[in-house]
Amino acid sequence: MKIFIVIPCYNEEAVLPKTLEVLGNLIKTIKVKTDADTELLLVDDGSRDRTWQMISDAAKEHKYVHGIKLSHNRGHQNALWAGMEAVVDHCDAMVSIDADLQDDENVIIDMVQQVQEGKDIIYGVRKERKTDTFFKRFTAQAFYKLMQSVDKDTVYNHADFRMMTNRTLKALMQYSERNLFLRAIVRQLGFREGFVYYDRKAREAGESKYPLTKMLSFSIDGITSFSVAPLKFITFLGLAMTLVAIIMIIFALVEHVQGKTIQGWTSLLVSMWFIGGIITTGVGITGVYIGKIYTEVKRRPRYFIEERV
């Protein structure tokens, strides 16, 4: 059985030596416990530091290390896709994991064993996030709960740490969309699923590649790529506001018939600003969906590979 571990990398100079050491030892353990041959594919997503040089040096030193360098920073999802596309014809199964190894690499052994037992996709699920800051933990939980509210198939506390067999990889490669949100796409494949649970570790070196701005952008991409719930919400809100307006018109007419004058410039201005805000928000949300359609119809390449080792 041949396995590839695909690792997207972006400015991982500080953590990469430790990552390569840990995964090198893991490869030996996997061989002993499962008799599977394992290799690494590191995808440099246009790093500005010495990440690619370190990958190249590791590939020269170890036969099990391979690397591809993207010509430009294309984002985590595209880098991961590039790695999967590169190994799909050369492996029986593939596991994706981030370079910081905050996800427990040791459960990959359990993933391999589940694949050998007949499972096709094994999801890595975080049990605890004690090493995260309160803000990171709170925002992550809010994101997963929001995703589950718009897509019931979302795996709670699962990121992109998963193992997929060759046939599921080939099925995934048939998806042609450019707005990638892999954790939702993979769930749509079906097949026989398994789960492994682990505690998230602290990052040993370097900085998180997902600051607040990127987290928000990723959340919006995830929701709008796989749900029209925001558009439905706007429609519902518009109908609700129309109903309120009708009630207010009836109330005003009744007051007028009774000879009463309705005062309230303040309430009128507040109502106008409120309605204006709702309309602007609705136009913005609609614009996000139109922008995604615009991106899809252009059919531009996801990435270009500058170099391989």
Positions of PLM-derived features:
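Amphipathic alpha-helical segments that mediate coupling or scaffolding at interfaces
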Residues: 8, 26, 58, 70, ...
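Hydrophobic helical membrane-anchoring modules
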Residues: 183-309
